[in-house]
């Protein structure tokens, strides 16, 4: 009997490619949310982007929907290696320093030339192979994202759980700019964005 590979079950909901999707943007909070509904991620200092892989082409959009594929040529080239027929990846374009920090002014300077230092840090997957994933839990979307970018130059933004009583403000000399709590449930874009 020959070995038969089972095709993984499709996730999400069958849907046409949606085009640009309004971003779920961070907002200021007074108290750190905790519990099963929340995960936390490092907030990088860069350009928020949405990478579209469709019809054998890659496009990179700003958070306002402007096509910056030519400005982020390296990111587009890196995204070409994503293991998917079609996808929408949400992330941040950064220039990482040796200590892991990111600095927006360094990124702006890199974009003045032909930068080879910029990197996409991916943190969400909104669409995959003809299926809309936005109603799925964030943890499930991130698990699929990690699979499709494995072996590429794209970095994966790990998430972590933290309880509000144990967290404190970021130290002034912290390697990270900030961290961002995200709802572990379905994707919600902010109105008017």
Where are the predicted features?
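Catalytic cores of nucleic-acid ligases and guanylyltransferases
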Residues: 1-193
């Amino acid at each position: 009997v020959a070995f038969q590979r089972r095709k993984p079950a499709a996730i999400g909901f069958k849907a046409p490619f949606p085009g640009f999707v309004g971003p779920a943007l961070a907002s200021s909070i007074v108290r750190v949310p905790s519990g099963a509904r929340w995960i936390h991620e490092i907030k990088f200092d860069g350009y928020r982007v949405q990478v579209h892989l469709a019809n054998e082409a890659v496009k990179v959009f700003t958070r306002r929907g402007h096509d910056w594929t030519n400005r982020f040529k390296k990111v587009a080239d890196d995204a070409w290696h994503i293991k998917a027929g079609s996808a929408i990846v949400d992330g941040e374009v950064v220039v990482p320093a040796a200590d892991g920090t990111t600095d927006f002014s360094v990124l702006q300077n890199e974009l003045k030339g032909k930068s080879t230092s910029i990197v996409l840090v991916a943190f969400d997957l909104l669409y995959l192979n003809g299926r809309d994933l936005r109603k799925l839990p964030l943890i499930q979307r991130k698990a699929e994202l990690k699979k499709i970018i494995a072996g590429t130059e794209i970095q994966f933004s790990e998430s972590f759980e933290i309880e509000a009583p144990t967290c404190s403000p970021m130290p002034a000399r912290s390697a990270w700019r900030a961290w961002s709590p995200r709802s572990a449930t379905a994707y919600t874009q902010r109105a008017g964005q």
